[in-house]
């Protein structure tokens, strides 16, 4: 597997720490300020060069920039304009080393939690979700069939360009994978639905981000899901994380303290021949950190990456 980590596009101490931990590749959130143009070759190249100069190879873009993706998911009057920007971005990404776009299809509200201060081991903070505490604007609404239609429309437009340039689309499950969040329908909520999604436009360039904690929240068998999608060579990217609880009430955990057998999960990836990027995700906020960005603070990443490296070495699964 390729050891990667998630970074904002501006240099930070996390870049240096990642290098010190042996991280080789970057999962990049592209700038979303008004000065950055995702269709401008010089702008995209400049972001790539920042990482290359730091010794991190850009490999995954995550997420699809919200400036375009929100319109695509809603299917509003700026959808075609937004898809055109994605089509222009794809060859620019390919020219600068990016091979994968990790994208979700949650309309209006992205990944959602009801707390960022759930107490985990030793008082560390993790994110949590309790449906009883969810507070979604009732004016936000989209139905299931519209989402399926919009996803198909998007994939039919972009997959041919992805095939041309060797870029892959890795669909991320909905988080949490509820059938509805408020009045917002969700579709990437089960193994069956995710299989349906990647079958909409059959292509070697359309697959999934195996965010394994989402499959756990679905109530799916995580190991069977890895085997199922792995047999098809449809796992393009792995989010290595875990939870404790049920679909309607769960919290994130330390990577060694959840409900999934993480050794067995890694063995499933290994046995499936997965050789793509993996990153730890949604790490605990540790003592002394300010929790400004729950799930993405610094010290917990050090622990999670070290844990992942140790497990991989123990089962003879090379990380590079």
Functional labels for PLM-detected ranges:
Residues 2-4, 9, 15-19, 52-53, ...:
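Histidine-acidic metal/acid-base catalytic patches
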Residues 12-14, 18-35:
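N-terminal ordered "arm"
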Residues 23-29, 60-63, 103, 130, ...:
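Non-cysteine beta-strand/loop elements that form the S-adenosyl-L-methionine
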Residues 25-28, 66-70, 136-139, 174-175, ...:
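A short alpha-helix capping/helix-coil boundary motif
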Residues 26, 34-35, 67-68, 109-110, ...:
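Short secondary-structure capping/turn micro-motifs that flank functional sites
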Residues 30-152, 156, 164:
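Structural motif corresponding to the early beta-alpha repeats
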Residues 66, 106, 174, 211, ...:
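Short loop/turn motifs enriched for small/polar and acidic residues
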Residues 135-150, 176-186, 251-252:
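Surface-exposed cleft-lining segments at the edges of enzyme active sites
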